[in-house]
């Protein structure tokens, strides 16, 4: 049994989010929640919400036992970039890109 949860267009770069995703891949759900609760990174808060959603999906839709669930797969893909300008000297402007990412998490036995 595999249950997934997805989150699209998160305002965080995929590179920074993958650092947190690597911490919880393959861990049990309880252990993953503890790791995410004590991680100081912004991505930890976001991934924790996705993990809690996947746990709720497994419990509600499949009637799964939470104690046996593991994070079977988690991957972070690059999303669309928000193009913005920042002011520079002499009336010029430089383009900056605000990165987004898509998080896909799967829990199972």
From Swiss-Prot:
Signal recorded as keyword: no
Gene3D superfamilies reported in the protein's UniProt record: Ribosomal protein L22/L17 (3.90.470.10)
BP GO annotations: translation
Entry's Gene Ontology cellular component terms: cytosolic large ribosomal subunit
Domain of life of the native organism: Bacteria
Keywords (A to Z) from UniProt: Ribonucleoprotein, Ribosomal protein, RNA-binding, rRNA-binding
Role this protein plays: This protein binds specifically to 23S rRNA; its binding is stimulated by other ribosomal proteins, e.g. L4, L17, and L20. It is important during the early stages of 50S assembly. It makes multiple contacts with different domains of the 23S rRNA in the assembled 50S subunit and ribosome. The globular domain of the protein is located near the polypeptide exit tunnel on the outside of the subunit, while an extended beta-hairpin is found that lines the wall of the exit tunnel in the center of the 70S ribosome.
Family according to the record: Belongs to the universal ribosomal protein uL22 family.
NCBIfam families: rplV_bact (TIGR01044)
Protein name as it appears in the record: Large ribosomal subunit protein uL22
Organism in which the protein naturally occurs: Chromobacterium violaceum (strain ATCC 12472 / DSM 30191 / JCM 1249 / CCUG 213 / NBRC 12614 / NCIMB 9131 / NCTC 9757 / MK)
Species classification: Bacteria, Pseudomonadati, Pseudomonadota, Betaproteobacteria, Neisseriales
């Amino acid at each position: 049994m595999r249950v997934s949860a997805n989150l699209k267009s998160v305002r965080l770069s995929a590179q920074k989010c993958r650092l947190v995703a690597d911490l919880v891949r393959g861990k049990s759900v309880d252990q993953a929640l503890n790791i995410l609760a004590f991680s100081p990174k912004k991505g930890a808060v976001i991934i924790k919400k996705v993990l809690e959603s996947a746990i709720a999906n497994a419990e509600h839709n499949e009637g799964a036992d939470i104690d046996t669930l593991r994070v079977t797969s988690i991957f972070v893909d690059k999303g669309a970039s928000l193009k913005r300008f920042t002011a520079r000297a002499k009336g010029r402007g430089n383009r900056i890109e605000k990165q987004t990412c898509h998080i896909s998490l799967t829990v199972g036995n």
